Amino acid sequence: PPRRQLRPPPPPPPPPPLLRTPAAPPPPRAAPAGLAEWARLWSGVTDVDDLVPGLREGMDRRSTRYLLWRDGGEVLGCAAVVTCAAGASLEHIVTRADHRGEGIGTALTRYALALALAAGARRVVLTASPDGEGIYRRLGFDTVGHVERYA
């Protein structure tokens, strides 16, 4: 199915993240040891040794922040915020299949958007699958184009 390019609403005040447990908010950025966990959830594969160096490169340049949603040590969601002079992109927002519908994707998106705005982004974009489009619409994003295929 085609993916949709979405445009964000005007910047809201940064909302607090929704928490599954008050003591466990998503960290602002995955620790280097957490990159493998992030890559496993995002990619859906267990052997992520080839992916981690590329992820670490964005982290080292400070252009990318990786977010993990944990509950009791289990990774249930992930997202990334990529910033540049032109703005920011919210990417790879994934909730583990057995925890979809619990608000994790919404909370990660809100948190990622708040980070992008706090970094000075005046324009924030994301690409949504048909399954996630409703979440982003409820958060005020608009469709501005369609992506037929990623390469």
How would you describe each model-predicted region?
Residues 1-3, 106, 118, 130-147:
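Conserved active-site alpha-helix within GNAT-family acetyltransferase domains
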